[in-house]
Design a protein with these regions (language model features):
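C-terminal ends and interior cores of transmembrane alpha-helices
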Residues: 81-121, 339-362
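Primarily marks hydrophobic transmembrane alpha-helices of the MFS/SLC 12-helix fold
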Residues: 76, 128, 335-338
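Residue-level signature of mid-helix packing/kink "hotspots" within the transmembrane helices
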Residues: 24, 53-61, 140, 174-175, ...
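Multi-pass alpha-helical transporter architecture, strongest
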Residues: 204-212, 348-356, 446-476
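Cytoplasmic helix-loop-helix junction between adjacent transmembrane helices
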Residues: 127, 131-171
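Extracytoplasmic
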Residues: 7-42, 97, 276-281
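Extracytoplasmic gate region of multi-pass secondary transporters
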Residues: 26-28, 254-313, 353, 380-384, ...
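Helix-loop-helix hairpin linking two adjacent transmembrane segments in secondary transporters
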Residues: 170-219
Length: 476
């Protein structure tokens, strides 16, 4: 039997890695390189990250339908092509700002004061908003296309594991980002960091064009592998298989409780991942005076996502082990696994207290919150892989990309609320020196957000379980 399905997973993994590398460039360059040049504060950055989240959310709704309409191969090509253009557009934001305000260099922008500095901050922020919008529009297609490709190439029992592997690309992207992006920005300028990382997407497109095809048409898939891929179809009649493959309307997708359960899971938890992805570098700088361009900063971020990568892949394997051992249906096994994963983010509650308690360690005290955050993030990725797989468990194949898009929109909205709220809270906390649970200033703001992140998964699981308490396949 051929094993081309794992080559497909490798390509999905590579695309997701590039996806997250492109997103990470801003979070790893704004505080040290972009902020001084454009006179930004946390509110400006919070506006940009929240806009990305909401535009990504809106785009997800249409990206799912677009992938269903175009098909997996063409839909993915368009998606990564657009987001690669968006990634490269960030590099011209500085030039655009210089042209608008009539200054000739980055040094002149950074040296500006008064009203001119305010104009620079505003114009540059809007330039980045445009670039982030194009990036979000393209990146919205990644998960609908990847989940659809997984459903095309894997039987139900293997989908969570396959999803956990390509979903680990998010962690790998975040893992290599601090090792590559800050040095690129430091030695070649932050603009080149955006350009070089953006070009990777165009390289991936060349492989996808020549390698991917529907498994029935693929010259790389033999009869034995095709039978393995389509083993679930033997459980249905020929007429039922035809209905499963039919495209399902957007309105019809909204009528399924299974859709709303997925929406609830995404809304409650996606923002947690984005918060740690976007704000951890800034948190380390604010709390411990550690910059991502220095050795300790790179080591901390690298370790965080190394732990996430290793642990999250095993999280995708857990439902398969439960199914094989107990004979539970896929949905029940996933929900049991997700409940286990939902308890691990509670460790994030200890990040701030322990980080402050061991302050005698100096900047090395940062290792404590980083390790706790990494465990919470690993639990998120394991949770996410299983959450995505619930779609294929209960919904027809013709609805998978659409429902993935709907859930992605919900996750983006939840993320936008958390990112914007966090940015405003941190700015307010710093300005007013607010106190909360023994913390003062920005540390108080971080502790509030950490509390929200810690409980999000248990709340999300409870809502999902109440909407779909038992395994029920949608019939058309």
């Amino acid at each position: 039997m051929t094993n081309f399905r794992w080559t497909v997973v490798a390509m999905l993994f590579a695309a997701t890695t590039v996806n997250y590398l492109d997103r990470q460039v801003l979070s790893l360059t704004w505080d040290e390189f972009i902020k001084p040049e454009f006179h930004w504060n946390e509110s400006h950055y919070g506006t940009i990250t929240s806009f990305f989240s909401i535009f990504y959310a809106i785009s997800m709704l249409f990206a799912g339908r677009f992938v269903e309409w175009m098909g997996t191969k063409k839909g993915y090509l368009w998606s990564i092509g657009v987001w690669s253009v968006g990634a490269c557009l960030h590099a011209v934001c500085g030039v655009a700002t210089e042209a608008y305000v009539g200054l000739g260099s980055a040094a002149e922008l950074a040296a500006a004061t008064g009203d001119v500095a305010v104009v620079i901050a505003t114009v540059s922020m809007w330039s980045f908003l445009v670039a982030r919008g194009v990036l979000a529009l393209g990146e919205a297609g990644n998960f609908p296309a990847a989940i659809k490709a997984t459903a095309e190439y894997f039987p139900k029992k293997d989908r969570a594991y396959a999803t956990s592997i390509f979903n680990a690309g998010a962690s790998i992207g975040a893992l290599f980002a601090p090792l590559t992006i800050p040095p690129l920005a430091k030695y070649f300028g932050w603009e080149m960091a955006f350009l070089i990382i953006g070009v990777l997407g165009f390289i991936w497109m060349g492989f996808w064009v020549f390698l991917y095809d529907d498994p029935k048409k693929s010259k790389h898939v033999n009869k034995a592998e095709l039978e393995y891929i389509e083993q679930d179809k033997h459980e249905l009649t020929e007429e039922e298989n035809k209905k499963v493959a039919e495209k399902v309307s957007l309105n019809k997708c909204f009528s399924f409780k299974q859709t709303w359960a997925f929406v609830a899971g995404k809304f409650m938890t996606d923002g947690v991942w984005w918060f740690f992805l976007f704000w951890t570098p800034s948190y380390l700088n604010t709390q411990f005076n550690i910059k991502t361009s220095e050795g300790l900063g790179m080591a901390l971020i690298f370790t965080l996502y190394l732990i996430v990568t290793v642990l999250s892949i095993y999280g995708g394997k857990l439902p398969t082990l439960i199914i094989n051992k107990s004979g539970l249906n896929p949905y029940a096994a996933r929900m049991r696994s997700m409940l286990i994963f939902a308890f691990f983010p509670l460790l994030v509650l200890l990040a701030q207290p322990l980080g402050m308690h061991f302050d005698y360690l100096g900047r090395n005290a940062a290792w404590i919150p980083v390790i706790l955050i990494s465990i919470g993030c690993a639990a998120h990725q394991a949770w996410s892989a299983n959450l995505f797989s619930t779609i294929g468990d209960m919904l027809p194949q013709g609805a998978i990309a659409t429902v993935t898009g709907i859930g992605g929109m919900a996750g983006g909205i939840g993320s936008m609320l958390l990112q914007k709220g966090a940015g405003n809270l941190f700015h307010y906390a710093g300005e007013t020196n607010m106190t909360f649970m023994g913390f003062e200033g920005k540390p108080a703001g971080y502790f509030i957000i950490f509390c929200i992140c810690a409980f999000a998964y248990l709340i999300g699981w409870a809502i999902m379980k109440s909407l779909v308490p038992k395994y029920k396949v949608v019939t058309l």
